[in-house]
Each structure stands twice: as C-alpha cells, then as structure tokens.
Amino acid sequence: MKMPKNNVYTVSRLNGEVRQLLEGELGKVWLEAEISNFSAPSSGHWYLTLKDNYAQIRAAMFKGRNRAVTFRPANGQQVLVKGAISVYEPRGDYQLIIDSMLPAGDGLLAQQYEALKMKLAAEGLFAADTKRPLPSNIQRIGVVTSATGAAIRDVLHVLKRRDPSIEVIIYPSQVQGEHADKSLCHAIMQANDRMEVDVLLLTRGGGSLEDLWCFNSEALAHTIYNSALPVVSAVGHEVDTTISDYVADLRAPTPSAAAELLSQDALSKADKLRMTMTRLKQGWQHYGLKQAQRFSQLHHRLERQDPKRRLQQYEQRFDELQLRLGAALTGKLHQMERRQQSLHARLNQVSPSHQLALAASRLTHQNQRLHSAMQARLNSAEKSLQYAAHQLETVSPLATLSRGYSITLDTEGKVLHSAQDVRTGARLTTKLVDGEVQSTVI
C-alpha cells in the first residue's frame, strides 16, 4: 500500500480540526439537562456532566462565567445552560463550555414570572375588554426606550420608510438594570402628563431573561394599565413575552414590527400590509441568521487566536492532575495506616508488657495449684496426727489410771514391778488418776 504524502494527520492536528469543525458548525446552543459528577476545585472553575435518560456530555464553566450564576449547582438538579461545543484537545474529548446557567423548569425567575402573571390576571389587568383600540389617524408616536439603543434606530428607520409624516417624540428611559422599571414608569407617566402624542410605544431589543426582567415589574404593569394613552409593547424578539406584553393594548414581536403596525394607515390596502409583514419577517429572520452566522464565525476565529483559551485548557489540565494527585495521596495514606495497624498488632504480641502479663497469669495459676496442694497435705497430716494421737491414747498409762489402776515409783522415779524391789523405810510415790500419794514402807 502506497503511503500518502500530504494527507497524514498528527493526533494534535486531527483534534484541532475536529474542534474547529464542531465550534464552527454548531456555535452557541441551549441545553436542558440534569447535573451529575459536579466538581468545584480550588481554581474556581466548575466541571460537571450533563445528562438525560439516554446520553451525557462533559461540561466546564470557568470562574469568569460562573460568578454570574445566582445559585449553587448540585447533582440531580435540572438546569438550562447556554454554551459552545468545544474539544479538549489533549484528550480528544468533546465538551460543552458553558456561558450561562439557569434553573430549568421551576427556576427562581420563572417562578416569580408565573406568580406575578397569575396575580395580575386575577386582578383583570390582561382582560380583553380593557384593551383600547389604536387611533385611526396616528400623527405623533411617543417612544419609551433607550435614546441610544438599537430599538429606537429600527423604529425611526421603519417609520421614515413607511410614513415620514409621522412625528416621533422620545421619552428616554433605562431598559435594563436594577432601577430600570422605575425609569420606565416615570417615562410613561411623563408622557401622560404632557398628552402630546397619540400612542405610546414601549420597546427595546432582544436580550436574556435577566436583561428583559424590568419589563416584568408589577409597578410597570399597573402604570401601563392606568395610562390614559394607548400603549403598544414590543420587547425583545418574537419568542420573548413579558408582563408588559400582556398588559399593553397591543403587542408587537419586535420594535420594527411595532413601527410597521403603527404606520399601517399609510398603506392603501390590507393585502399590501400582509405582504410587507411577511417580507419583513422573512428578511429580518434571514438577516438575523446571516448576521448571527457571521458573528459566530468571527467569534470562533477570534477565540482560536486568543491565548485565554489556551490558558483555560492548561488550567483545566492542572485541575485534572490535582484531583488525580489528591486521590493517589489519599490511597497511599490509607495503605500506610493499614500497615501501621498491622505492625502495632505484631509489636503487641512481643512487647515486654504483654510477656509480663502472660507470666503473671501463669504465676497466679501456679500459686493456686501450690495452695491447693499445701492444703491437701495439711489435711492429710492432720488426719494422720489424729490417728496417732488415738493410738497413743490407747496405750497411754493415763488411760490405765483412768480404769482404777495406779503406778508406784521409787525415789528415783522408777516404776516398781514387784514388792521385792523395795525395802523397809523406802519412800514411795503412788500415782492415781487424779493425783499422787506419798507413802513409807514399814
């Protein structure tokens, strides 16, 4: 087989091209999944596995991104994440690099949104019979939005093209941030105080759920509901729906679409309006898709040249080695502890204290045996002594005396056995059972 000269890949080159292919084709994706194997090492990065019932994928969220997460992820938790597919080239593993993370389903913001929506609906703020019709001849449009945002530019561009005679008055307001809802309320009330326009357009461009959150304010909902001027809400993209959309008299999917609706009387026929709306929607979608693809390509080209990505890969590798080292050290410590316990047990078997304890036990046993033997000997000796005493008692002279006999002794204490052994005048001693009698031979 002939070896190709120009088509032989190295592993590094292959992994690099796979990474470029995945990142270039997929771009940013939204993913709903369950968290498992969650790890948060000292570097501050997060590593986890995202899974469903049939598959799983590794994921990483670096500390520059996870600082914005408002909750602590946990194993078993359902989340909604946005990120880009990437390849960790040293291992050839593909993974998801997470940019943002939200609780899925019953997340905090989603819960607040649904609770407020139900409350306002119960109060009647969404009722169809409270919606006011738009004026038939709109001459002035008041726009409540950021004076420098993309939304006002889109609105002015559409109105200029469709009906240049319509006058636009801008009521500048914050459309994002902590106090944006108060700013929006103030702008709407200012327009109602002046009463210089025919209709109000409340609008801003697209953004995340957090970016659009000021349009979900209860105070803003009541301000729109109490407005004497009709209000059109056009917040975000077509897929975004805010509380202001429900309360307003009319909802438009985008700022440009709202401008189209408000200038509809300048068109002579409804058919032309429908055709224009269709073309506008298609053109906007095509333009948005094209711009998104172009931005994604430029973004990935920039990321490939960015040393920050390489640094993140090295940090990820360092975290992995740190975890492996920690596991190895833990295993070694457990092995040493088991070895120490074994040596301690063996040392106890040969230690002097152990040997002394054994000797003391044996000595106690021997003492008990000796005491038993001595007691047995004493008992035996006592019985022998009693027997001998009995025998002596049987042959004792005292026993003879107790039967009525006596013993006669001469002056030298010798027992007299015959009368011929004494002479006249001799002194004799006669022993009786209860005493002695002195006598003289006549």
Curated annotation (Swiss-Prot):
**Which coarse location class applies to the principal site listed for this UniProt protein?**
cytoplasm
Give the CC-aspect GO terms.
cytoplasm; exodeoxyribonuclease VII complex
Question: Which keywords annotate this record?
Answer: Cytoplasm, Exonuclease, Hydrolase, Nuclease
Q: Name one Pfam family in it.
A: tRNA_anti_2
Name the domain of life this protein comes from.
Answer: Bacteria
Annotated compartments: Cytoplasm
Q: What is its EC number?
A: 3.1.11.6
- InterPro entries the record matches: Exonuc_VII_L, Exonuc_VII_lsu_C, OB-fold_nuc-bd_dom
Q: Which GO molecular function entries does the Swiss-Prot or TrEMBL record give?
A: exodeoxyribonuclease VII activity; nucleic acid binding
GO terms under biological process: DNA catabolic process
Chain segments annotated as transmembrane = none
Recorded catalytic reaction(s): these are: Exonucleolytic cleavage in either 5'- to 3'- or 3'- to 5'-direction to yield nucleoside 5'-phosphates
The entry assigns this protein to a family as follows:
Belongs to the XseA family.
What this chain does, per the record?
Bidirectionally degrades single-stranded DNA into large acid-insoluble oligonucleotides, which are then degraded further into small acid-soluble oligonucleotides.
Q: How does this polypeptide assemble, per the annotation?
A: Heterooligomer composed of large and small subunits.
Q: What is this protein called?
A: Exodeoxyribonuclease 7 large subunit
Q: Which gene encodes it?
A: xseA
